[in-house]
Amino acid sequence: TKTLKNATKLNKGAKVFLHPVKNPKLYGIATIKNKKIINLKEKPLITKSNLAVTGLYFFDKQVVKLSKTLKPSKRKELEIVDLLNKYRKKNALKAEFLGRGGAWLDAGSIDDYYDTTSFVSTIEKRQGFKIACLEEIALNNGWINKVVLNESIKFYGNCEYAKYLKNLL
């Protein structure tokens, strides 16, 4: 989409994509004021916001350096929210909203995973197109040619995915 293509042009700072959710306690949540992220918290018990951090991020070249400064959280994990907060504190974090008409699905639990796979399967069957077929995206954008696509088809062998790719030729 145009929004994603614009995000790939990011030269400085970071960009995070947000989407409203019903149960903010299950996600990393952003609080926005005057179109700026003023707070980011992982799985907050109390929050005034319902804007989930979707897991779609764009970073500048500083991301590796900043990542190396992260410390494990109480959950003994390196948290993406901590990295995003480093950008926020430098006033270098931008937000983009995935609004109505788009689909963002979390697959953090077994039930969520089932719902996500069912959704993707239904859309693919009804429309006859794969969702996020990397070879198809690359071919359509001119990043690969049909020779490279043919190599992928050989790699995948005799499976449904390879048959789908053959139809792109």
Identify the function of each model-found stretch:
Residues W143-L169:
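Short, amphipathic C-terminal "tail helix"
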Residues T1-N34, F58-K61, K65-L70:
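Conserved beta-loop-beta/alpha segment of the NTase-like Rossmann-fold superfamily
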Residues T8, K36-E136, W143, V147, ...:
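Catalytic-core segments of class I nucleotidyltransferases/pyrophosphorylases
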